[in-house]
Every structure is written in structure tokens, then in C-alpha cells.
């Protein structure tokens, strides 16, 4: 979508093939990301269903055996504390009416609906992958038509032939709009991921703090009314929280859809209106976008999204550093750390893909002769088309695994050169777990959070029930 015409026909062909190569890889990466998320979500749903059935069986067994009087329910189907573990004496009355099975079933159903209706990070990544997929498909189609079907590429539609020159509609001008729409949508969805994760970090800290205070107050109440008060308050709170969160999540979801799809579509339409045909008498006619319109409708939203995503990522990192000192849950710390690592990778991807394009645009924008560098144009066009495949690699944490692999390889090489064979063997056993890049470190591997190398980020739904200590 360059606004200059200083490059030759051969130069534009080279740039076009670079974009086609990068877009082809991005199609593979975008489809792979969507498939992996869908598979992981199915596995998570089956796992949660099994856990709910097991919890329901335990509740029914406790009710039938009469031993449920020693169980204090703290959260819906997720955490239970024994009165013996809390050093609280059981109620002095001989027996009481336990919680009916129907209430347990109702709570399980509410939790299931609540989890399904939560706005999840994996859902945001799917939309980001769809936007990358559309951008790649449009990029390949437009570039191939420009190179091999140029007569149809610049052919003006009959309905617009009698209009002004800048308003001529062709495949070329429409292509500028749809490519711009898709790429702008990727900017907005990347920003949406960082904003949503930051909001979840804040809300999870607040909810956990309130839940802990309420649990302590409820446990310190009169032992005779302790269980009834907790059950009644939690049932009422679960219903109210479900209704409120359901409404708020629907509003948030619709807002994100509007911002990340509708607004980019409007901006893409502006790019179409700002496109014009140039070099009609050359061997490879093409169309360009007015530099001012391109700045306002494309690069200005890009700059805003880059700055905002960086800002929210820094806030999340700062928030995590503060919460880490006060949090005693190692599993929660590991989960939050993985979320931040992948968010940083997504930020790095969008910076790597679009900073060269920004540099190229502003060089031509402020130069008098619309100066362009062929090598910079090829790099920027190729890398920006690779956003989908780079997001896919970030989703798999390939970069971190490669770094760990080469670090361990260096340690292994140093250990082999050491004269102390015992220390060498110990270091090798500590540094390697399976000896390949598709495995985690051998030290302190959390089976619950590191079961599968390929499916990590899709588990970071960060629902309130998931972030509590189990």
C-alpha cells in the first residue's frame, strides 16, 4: 500500500513476491493457531466435565454417609475446607439437614454456563488469527493479480467510469481497502488482548481479596450457624455474580467486536476512497493511496495500538510484580507468568512486523521526491505479511523453547569439557528433561500447568474460579 511510484516494475514485482511468500506462511500459521485452540478447548471442556462429575459424586457420597457436616463450602464446586484442618470444632448439635443434591446440581450448571459465557483470551486470539488469515488471503490475491492479471487488476468498474479520477473503483483500489481493513483489525485485536488481560488481573485480585475476607468472617461466626450462613450467602452471591458477569461479558464482547471489526472496516473504506490509479502507461500499472489518507486511516491507528499495547503490557508486568510478593500460590504465579510471557511475545511480533513499514512510510512521506529504498520495501512488505506465522510461533512459545535449548546445549558442552564427570552428569540431568526442545525444564515441572508444550496459552482463560488455589 505504498503511496509512492518511484520504484520500477521489476522492483514492485520483487516486493509483491516477498509479500506472497510471507502471506503464504501466515495462512498456515493462522489456521494452525485456530485448530490448536479448538482442540485444546475441547480437551479442557472434557477435563472440567470429569472434575464436576467427580465433585458431584463426592458431594452425594458425603450426603448419603452423613459426613458432609464437616465440610465448609468456600467456592462453587472448586474449593472445600475441612473444619478439622482449620482447627474448628464441629457443630455441637447432633445433626442438621445437609445441602440438597438439587442445589449442588444447580451450582454446577451455573458454573458450567458461567465458564462457557466468559469472554476468554483464547477467543480473542481466534479473532486475531481470523484477521491475519483474511489479510494473508487478500494479500496473495491482490499481488498475484497485479503481477499476472494486470489488465483485470486495474480495470475500472463500469458504474464508476464517469466519476472523478480519484473515485475510480477497481480490483486494485478495493484491494487496498480490504488489506488495510484486515491489518487494522489485527492491530485492534492485539490491543484488545492486552486490555482484557489487564482487566482480568485487576478483577481477579479484587475478587480473591474479597472472597478471602468473606470466608474468614463467615468461618469465625457462630459455629451453630456457620454452614448455613456460608451456603446461603454463597448461593445468593453465585446467582447474583452469574447474572451480573453474564450481562457485563456480553457488553464487553459486543464492544470488542465493534471496535475490532466495524471500525477497521470503516477505515478500510476510507482507504478505498483515497486510492488512485497511477502509471497507466507503464508495463505494470498499479494504484496507490494518498499519503495523507494513508497516514490518518492506517498508520495513525497502528501507532496508537502499538503505544497502547506497550502501555498495558508494562502495567500488567508491574501489577504482576506487586502481586507476586503477596501471593503464596506457586501455581497462580506460574500461570500469570506464562500469560505475561505470551503477551510480550505478541507485542514483539507486531513491533517487528510493522516498525520497518512505519520507517519506510515516514521516509517517503517527509522526503521531497518520495524517496524509497528497495531493500527496506522488500523487508517491510515481507515481514508485515508474516504476522500470522509469527503469532503462531509465539502461541507455541517456540522462541522461548529455542532459547532454552541453546542455553542447555551450551551448558552441556561446557559440562562435557569439565574434568569432574560427576558434576557433569548431575548438571546434564538437571538441565535436560528428554533432551529436546519440545520438553520443559527438568527442574520443578508443574504437571498441572505444563502438561503439553503445544497447548499452553489457550488454557489462560483466567476465569475467577480457575485462578483460585486448588
From Swiss-Prot:
Glycans are attached at residue 162. Gene3D superfamilies: Rhodopsin 7-helix transmembrane proteins. GO terms for cellular component: plasma membrane. GO terms for molecular function: G protein-coupled receptor activity. Keywords: Disulfide bond, G-protein coupled receptor, Glycoprotein, Membrane, Receptor, Transducer, Transmembrane, Transmembrane helix. The gene is crlD. It comes from the Eukaryota. Residues 1-16, 145-176, 275-295, 364-372 are extracellular. It comes from Dictyostelium discoideum (Social amoeba). Its main location: membrane. It is found in: Membrane. The chain crosses the membrane at residues 17-37, 124-144, 177-197, 254-274, 296-316, 343-363, 373-393. Residues 38-123, 198-253, 317-342, 394-470 are cytoplasmic. It is a multi-pass membrane protein. This is Cyclic AMP receptor-like protein D. Belongs to the G-protein coupled receptor 5 family. GO terms for biological process: adenylate cyclase-activating G protein-coupled receptor signaling pathway. InterPro entries: GPCR_Rhodpsn (IPR000276), GPCR_Rhodpsn_7TM (IPR017452). Disulfide bonds join 172-287. Receptor for cAMP.
Amino acid at each position: 500500500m505504498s503511496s509512492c511510484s518511484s520504484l520500477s516494475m521489476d522492483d514492485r514485482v520483487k516486493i509483491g513476491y516477498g509479500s506472497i511468500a510471507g502471506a503464504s506462511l501466515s495462512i498456515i500459521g493462522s489456521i494452525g493457531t485456530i485448530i490448536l485452540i479448538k482442540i485444546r478447548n475441547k480437551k479442557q471442556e472434557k477435563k472440567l466435565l470429569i472434575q464436576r462429575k467427580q465433585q458431584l459424586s463426592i458431594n452425594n457420597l458425603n450426603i448419603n454417609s452423613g459426613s458432609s457436616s464437616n465440610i465448609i463450602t468456600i467456592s462453587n464446586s472448586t474449593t472445600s475446607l475441612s473444619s478439622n484442618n482449620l482447627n474448628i470444632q464441629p457443630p455441637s448439635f447432633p445433626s442438621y439437614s445437609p445441602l440438597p443434591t438439587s442445589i449442588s446440581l444447580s451450582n454446577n450448571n451455573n458454573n458450567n454456563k458461567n465458564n462457557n459465557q466468559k469472554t476468554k483470551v483464547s477467543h480473542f486470539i481466534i479473532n486475531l488469527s481470523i484477521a491475519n488469515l483474511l489479510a494473508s488471503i487478500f494479500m496473495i490475491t491482490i499481488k498475484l493479480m497485479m503481477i499476472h492479471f494486470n489488465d483485470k487488476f486495474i480495470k475500472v468498474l463500469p458504474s464508476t467510469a464517469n466519476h472523478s479520477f480519484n473515485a475510480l473503483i477497481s480490483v486494485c483500489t478495493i484491494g487496498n481497502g480490504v488489506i488495510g481493513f484486515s491489518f487494522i483489525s489485527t492491530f485492534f485485536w492485539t490491543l484488545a488482548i492486552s486490555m482484557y488481560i489487564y482487566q482480568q488481573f485487576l478483577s481477579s485480585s479484587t475478587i480473591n481479596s474479597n472472597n478471602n475476607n468473606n470466608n474468614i468472617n463467615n468461618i469465625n461466626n457462630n459455629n451453630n450457624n456457620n454452614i448455613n450462613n456460608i451456603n446461603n450467602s454463597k448461593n445468593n452471591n453465585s446467582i447474583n455474580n452469574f447474572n451480573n458477569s453474564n450481562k457485563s461479558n456480553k457488553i464487553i464482547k459486543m464492544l470488542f467486536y465493534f471496535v475490532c471489526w466495524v471500525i477497521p472496516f470503516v477505515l478500510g473504506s476510507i482507504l478505498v476512497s483515497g486510492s488512485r490509479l497511477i502509471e497507466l502507461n507503464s508495463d505494470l500499472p498499479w494504484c496507490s493511496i494518498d499519503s495523507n489518507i494513508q497516514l490518518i486511516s492506517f498508520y495513525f491507528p497502528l501507532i496508537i495500538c502499538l503505544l497502547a499495547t506497550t502501555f498495558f503490557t508494562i502495567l500488567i508486568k508491574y501489577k504482576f510484580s506487586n502481586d507476586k510478593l503477596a501471593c503464596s500460590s506457586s501455581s497462580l504465579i506460574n500461570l500469570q507468568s506464562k500469560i505475561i510471557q505470551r503477551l510480550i511475545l505478541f507485542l514483539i511480533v507486531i513491533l517487528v512486523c510493522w516498525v520497518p513499514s512505519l520507517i519506510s512510510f515516514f521516509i517517503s512521506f517527509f522526503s521531497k521526491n518520495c524517496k524509497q529504498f528497495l531493500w527496506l520495501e522488500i523487508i517491510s512488505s515481507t515481514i508485515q505479511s508474516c504476522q500470522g506465522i509469527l503469532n503462531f510461533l509465539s502461541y507455541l512459545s517456540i522462541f522461548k523453547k529455542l532459547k532454552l535449548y541453546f542455553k542447555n546445549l551450551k551448558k552441556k558442552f561446557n559440562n562435557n569439557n569439565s574434568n569432574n564427570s560427576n558434576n557433569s552428569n548431575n548438571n546434564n540431568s538437571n538441565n535436560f528433561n528428554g533432551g529436546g526442545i519440545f520438553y520443559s525444564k527438568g527442574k520443578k515441572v508443574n504437571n498441572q500447568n505444563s502438561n503439553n508444550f503445544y497447548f499452553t496459552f489457550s488454557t489462560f482463560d483466567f476465569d475467577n474460579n480457575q485462578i483460585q488455589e486448588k
